């Protein structure tokens, strides 16, 4: 149930009845403070201005038409014309009861869309590093949320599997296989790439061979395609191990690398020329965009084909957007790519729109994110200044969590300890990132992320187990509890219930904006409200069975909401800690 949407509809109808235009915005928001009720309608200011009347006067007229019987216990005008809405306890009780009857906790399904989500995108023949973490886990949280809401989501892992470097890599792979007799595991991808590059720079005969191999690969030679495929397979097999460790839903089937679009590129260049969008300039094919200016203030030239006939990332991205609309039938496309690529994407999409490849009705959205920084405020590096491998980071997370869990549970069996350490360690790394607004840089800090207090994964996982422990102590049959009524008479019960019922609103924001930190903040708030409720409203020692069972149902909805919310973030929950 989306209470915000219900109230928006009711307030909008009342505003129209009071003389507001049919497209008026009621601007119903969750109230920031308890004294302002559960929701506040702020739309009177803008509409009153259009009608040439005082906002408070409009608010008074709206109130005469606003029927919230059975929903609100009190509606009042505050300040210059805000309408504060206090929800009726009986309404809250009824909605809690309804939410508990469905696995989806009463979350309604929006109109189903096909949504393509572009995320992770590591490079072939290189190990994933910390720079891939944000795109991978933020993108996956968006995917999980959209799928939970009922959308058809297509994961697109736009891996870097094409380019001139593959001549060098194939030549080096060939040399290694000749010297090491048969196949090699390529265990050290980073070392493999580094050695290939060193030979390319120092050995002219090797470099010449590499350049010839690029031409053969690009012309579709079977042997070179096989060698290229081997490099892709080895890399993606290693990456899959990382995805599985991260509890990320990407699989090999989601790989849609740069190479996928190669056959489209000549046709796109020819089409852009035919449409008069692309012109020859100094031997290259260029699209000049009035929307972007160069240093001289002239339209910026975006190269789509080089003098030597080679294509650029922009050309691939144009083809990619076209493919996602025409072949995948996307209604919406989300790109989880760091903020430094913003201008590049905007240029590619401007060309896409001008060429008519994707209509304006299909949003292309750059959900950009900032950088992961060390405690010194500089990009996160190893002690020697190198790039941190993602596998090494996860190993350290597991080791630190293992120590932490063993300290708190010295008698825990080894297999249980390992399972718990994995949930806490990986959860801590992911949640520390997901709980920050993705558009900003954030400081990576082991101590903060593994703390059992504050907005952290260990705190949220512990909060969940704490609610479950109430049920273990209550020793009650869930079926027997199902028929018990929900009674809301205390303020803390009402506050917890109202917040729990905002789960759908939170999911809707995450789905619309691609901002998992909103879900983290919501769940942290729920955990805090439950804590206050637990302290001030005795559950197991309640004055009678009716109150006890009602409070157990609030605890039950809290547990289900925390579990489901954390699941949309890809954070594992545990039964005991």
Swiss-Prot record:
Swiss-Prot/TrEMBL keywords: Aminoacyl-tRNA synthetase, ATP-binding, Cytoplasm, Ligase, Nucleotide-binding, Protein biosynthesis
Catalytic activity: tRNA(Arg) + L-arginine + ATP = L-arginyl-tRNA(Arg) + AMP + diphosphate
Organism: Salmonella paratyphi A (strain AKU_12601)
Cellular compartment(s): Cytoplasm
GO MF annotations in UniProt: arginine-tRNA ligase activity; ATP binding
EC number of this enzyme: 6.1.1.19
Membership in a protein family: Belongs to the class-I aminoacyl-tRNA synthetase family.
Domain of life, source organism: Bacteria
UniProt short sequence motif 'HIGH' region, positions renumbered to this chain: 122-132
PROSITE patterns for this protein: AA_TRNA_LIGASE_I (PS00178)
Name this protein carries in UniProt: Arginine--tRNA ligase
One cellular component term from this protein's GO annotations in UniProt: cytoplasm
One example of a Gene Ontology biological process annotation: arginyl-tRNA aminoacylation
Pfam family, any one: Arg_tRNA_synt_N
Subunit-structure text: Monomer.
């Amino acid at each position: 149930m989306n209470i915000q949407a219900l109230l928006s509809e009711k307030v909008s109808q009342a505003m129209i009845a009071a003389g507001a235009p049919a497209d008026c915005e009621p601007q119903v928001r969750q109230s920031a403070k308890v004294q302002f009720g559960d929701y506040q309608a702020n739309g009177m200011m803008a509409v009153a201005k259009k009608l040439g009347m005082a906002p408070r006067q409009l608010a008074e007229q709206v109130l005469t038409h606003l029927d919230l019987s059975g929903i609100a216990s009190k509606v009042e005008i505050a300040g210059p014309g805000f309408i504060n809405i206090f929800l009726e306890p009986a309404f809250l009780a009824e909605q809690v009861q309804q939410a508990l009857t469905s696995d989806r906790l009463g979350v309604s399904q929006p109109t189903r869309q096909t949504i393509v989500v572009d995320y992770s995108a590591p490079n072939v023949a290189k190990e994933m590093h910390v720079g891939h973490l944000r795109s991978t886990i933020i993108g996956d949280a968006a995917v999980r949320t959209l799928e939970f809401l009922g959308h058809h989501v297509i994961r697109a892992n736009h891996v870097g599997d094409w380019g001139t470097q593959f001549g060098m890599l194939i030549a080096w792979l060939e040399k290694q296989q000749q010297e090491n007799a048969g196949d090699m595991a390529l265990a050290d991808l980073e070392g493999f790439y580094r050695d290939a590059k060193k030979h390319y720079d120092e050995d002219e005969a090797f470099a010449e061979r590499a350049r010839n191999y690029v031409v053969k690969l690009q012309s579709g030679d079977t042997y070179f395609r096989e060698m290229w495929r081997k490099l892709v397979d080895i890399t993606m097999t290693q990456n899959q191990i990382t995805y599985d460790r991260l509890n990320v839903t990407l699989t090999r089937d989601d790989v849609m690398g740069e190479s996928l679009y190669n056959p489209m590129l000549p046709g796109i260049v020819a089409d852009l020329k035919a449409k008069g969008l692309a012109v020859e300039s100094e031997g290259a094919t260029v699209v000049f965009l009035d929307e972007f200016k160069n240093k001289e203030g002239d339209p910026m030239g975006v190269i789509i084909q080089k003098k030597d006939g080679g294509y650029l990332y922009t050309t691939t991205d144009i083809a990619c957007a076209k493919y996602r609309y025409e072949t995948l039938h996307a209604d919406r496309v989300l790109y989880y790519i760091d903020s430094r690529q913003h201008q590049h994407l905007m240029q590619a999409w401007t060309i896409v729109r001008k060429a008519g490849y994707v209509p304006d009705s299909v949003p292309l959205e750059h959900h950009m994110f900032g950088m992961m920084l060390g405690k010194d405020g500089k990009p996160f590096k190893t002690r020697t200044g190198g790039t941190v491998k993602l596998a090494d980071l996860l190993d350290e997370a597991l080791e630190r969590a293992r120590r932490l869990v063993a300290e708190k549970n010295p008698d825990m069996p080894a297999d249980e300890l390992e399972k718990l350490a994995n949930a806490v360690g990986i959860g801590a790394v992911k949640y520390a990132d997901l709980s920050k607004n993705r558009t900003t840089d954030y400081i990576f800090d082991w101590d903060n992320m593994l703390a059992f207090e504050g907005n952290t994964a260990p705190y949220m996982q512990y909060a969940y187990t704490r609610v479950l422990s109430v049920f273990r102590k209550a020793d009650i049959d869930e079926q027997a509890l199902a028929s018990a009524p929900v009674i809301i008479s205390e303020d803390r019960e009402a506050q917890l219930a109202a917040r729990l019922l905002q789960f759908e609103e939170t999911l809707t924001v995450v789905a619309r904006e691609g901002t998992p930190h909103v879900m983290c903040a919501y769940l942290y708030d729920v955990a805090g409200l439950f804590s206050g409720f637990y302290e001030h409203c005795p559950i197991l020692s309640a004055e009678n069975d009716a109150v006890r069972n009602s409070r157990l149902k609030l605890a039950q909805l809290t547990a289900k909401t925390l579990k489901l919310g954390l699941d949309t973030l890809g954070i594992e929950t545990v039964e005991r800690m």
